[in-house]
C-alpha cells in the first residue's frame, strides 16, 4: 500500500472516531410523533396522521377535507414560516415536556427551536381536538385535493 493511501485511511479512521463521540440528535419528526401521542394520550397511533386528507403527510394542496386536515395545513404553513426565518423545521431538535394537559415547549432559548416547537405543540393539540374520520385516510388526492 502506498504511503498516501495510508494517510487517507488514517484520516478517515480518525474522523470516524471523532464522529462516534458526538451524540446522535433526534430528528424533529420523531419528537413531533411523541408530541402527538402526548396530546391524544395515546388514543391514536401517529401513523394514522401520515396519509390523512390533503395535508397530513408529505406535501399538501387543495382544500382541506375537514378540521383535522386544516390542522395539518396550519402545521405545513407554520413550517413554511420557519423556513422563511432560516430555520430547518424537520431537523430542529428541542426540549419539551408531556404533562397532564398535553405537551409544551420547555426552556428553549434558540429562536428556531422555539418556533418549531410551538408549531409542533399547537399541531399536536389541534390533532387531539379534531375528530378523526376514517373515510379521509388514504384518499385519492388527485381527485379530492384540487
Swiss-Prot record:
Snake venom phospholipase A2 (PLA2) that inhibits collagen-induced platelet aggregation. PLA2 catalyzes the calcium-dependent hydrolysis of the 2-acyl groups in 3-sn-phosphoglycerides. Its EC number is 3.1.1.4. The keyword Calcium applies. Residues 1-19 form the signal peptide. The keyword DNA repair does not apply. This is Acidic phospholipase A2 S13-69J. It catalyses: a 1,2-diacyl-sn-glycero-3-phosphocholine + H2O = a 1-acyl-sn-glycero-3-phosphocholine + a fatty acid + H(+). It is an enzyme of class 3 (hydrolase). Disulfide bonds join 38-98, 54-145, 56-72, 71-126, 78-119, 87-112, 105-117. Pfam families: Phospholip_A2_1 (PF00068). Ca(2+) binds at residues 55, 57, 59, 76. Residues 20-27 form a propeptide. GO terms for biological process: arachidonate secretion; lipid catabolic process; phospholipid metabolic process. InterPro entries: PLipase_A2, PLipase_A2_Asp_AS, PLipase_A2_dom, PLipase_A2_dom_sf, PLipase_A2_His_AS. Expressed by the venom gland. Its cofactor is Ca(2+). The active site is at residues 75, 120. GO terms for cellular component: extracellular region. GO terms for molecular function: calcium ion binding; calcium-dependent phospholipase A2 activity; phospholipid binding; toxin activity. It is found in: Secreted. Binds 1 Ca(2+) ion. CDD domains: PLA2c (cd00125). It comes from Austrelaps superbus (Lowland copperhead snake).
Amino acid at each position: 500500500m502506498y504511503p498516501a493511501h495510508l494517510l487517507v485511511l488514517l484520516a478517515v479512521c480518525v474522523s470516524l472516531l471523532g464522529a462516534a463521540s458526538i451524540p446522535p440528535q433526534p430528528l424533529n419528526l420523531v419528537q413531533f410523533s411523541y408530541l402527538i401521542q402526548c396530546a391524544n394520550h395515546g388514543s391514536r397511533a401517529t401513523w394514522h396522521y401520515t396519509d390523512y386528507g390533503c395535508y397530513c403527510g408529505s406535501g399538501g394542496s387543495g382544500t382541506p377535507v375537514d378540521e383535522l386536515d386544516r390542522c395539518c395545513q396550519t402545521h405545513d404553513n407554520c413550517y413554511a414560516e420557519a423556513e422563511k426565518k432560516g430555520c430547518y423545521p424537520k431537523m430542529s431538535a428541542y426540549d419539551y415536556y408531556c404533562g397532564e394537559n398535553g405537551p409544551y415547549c420547555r426552556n428553549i432559548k434558540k429562536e428556531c427551536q422555539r418556533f418549531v416547537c410551538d408549531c409542533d405543540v399547537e399541531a399536536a393539540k389541534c390533532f387531539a381536538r379534531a375528530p378523526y374520520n376514517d373515510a379521509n385516510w388514504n384518499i385519492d388526492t388527485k381527485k379530492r385535493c384540487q
